[in-house]
Amino acid sequence: MKIIQVILKFIIIFIIPSIHAQECKLEFKTEKIHVNGVTYDQKVGDPITPIADAIKADNLEEVKKILDEGYGVNQPCLGWVPLDYAISNNNIKIADFLLKRDASMSLIHINIGFMKSEIAEFLINQGMSPNLRYEDGITGMMLAAERNNPDLIKLLLKLGVNPNVQNSKTGMTSLMYAASYLNVEVVRVLLEQGVDPNIKDFKGKRALNWIAVDANRKLHASDGEYYAALFLAPFETKQKIIKERNSIKTRNKEKEKEIKKLFNSHR
């Protein structure tokens, strides 16, 4: 009997997790991708495992089953842990379950700036810092400003996050990111909250000087670090996106005008 128990324990601890690990793969699907105001049909790769499928299907019972079979609650698949899938799907119920099963928030791969406000608020209430700074010097609020996520901006402001914090490498503020990408509503929210528009980045530029800089500039292959569509795209598609984007000569002058008006009204 003891031999059987030892064998079963060995299978649960070593064999099943190994099988699950082998199931980790990159699944490609076609999505609408937005790069600097242009929309593309692009194949996007997502790390896929059985637990990821269960989370996407909102199947809590299947998630429980997979974990009970020995899949690690913090086991990564191409950098993603199960909690990342719950965050990506804005699934508070499963995120809560994973945390109760000892999922570590320190292993979260997704920048808070990519999160929807609901899941971000839940995680912050569970102890995640709203002031996280990432390797490129950017904060969650800066990325939310770049990605045009006013709801998350409002949440972070409500929680006391300082909107005047600067990127530790470039000196840019959240207001500069919002102005650079012509995100009118984010600019409005930040200015109404009393953000300082006169802060200078490390090259001496104020937020007013950043209006439409990224929205209008030409793309380069190195931008793959910042644009998910370029980062995930095959080489030929990457070149196609860059070529098409750089051939566009029109500017969104209405948004530029609206943002300048907002700056003038908050001097």
Swiss-Prot record:
Q: Name one Pfam family in it.
A: Ank_2
What InterPro entries does this protein map onto?
Ankyrin-SOCS_box_domain, Ankyrin_rpt, Ankyrin_rpt-contain_sf
Q: Name one GO biological process term.
A: positive regulation of protein catabolic process
Chain coiled-coil ranges: 238-265
ANK repeat ranges, renumbered to this chain = 46-75, 78-107, 136-165, 170-199
Superkingdom is: Bacteria
**Entry-linked Gene3D superfamilies:** Ankyrin repeat-containing domain (1.25.40.20)
Q: Does the keyword Cell inner membrane apply?
A: no
Kindly state which keywords UniProt assigns to this record, in alphabetical order. Answer: ANK repeat, Coiled coil, Repeat
Could you identify this protein by its name? Putative ankyrin repeat protein RF_1099
Organism, by scientific name, is Rickettsia felis (strain ATCC VR-1525 / URRWXCal2) (Rickettsia azadi)
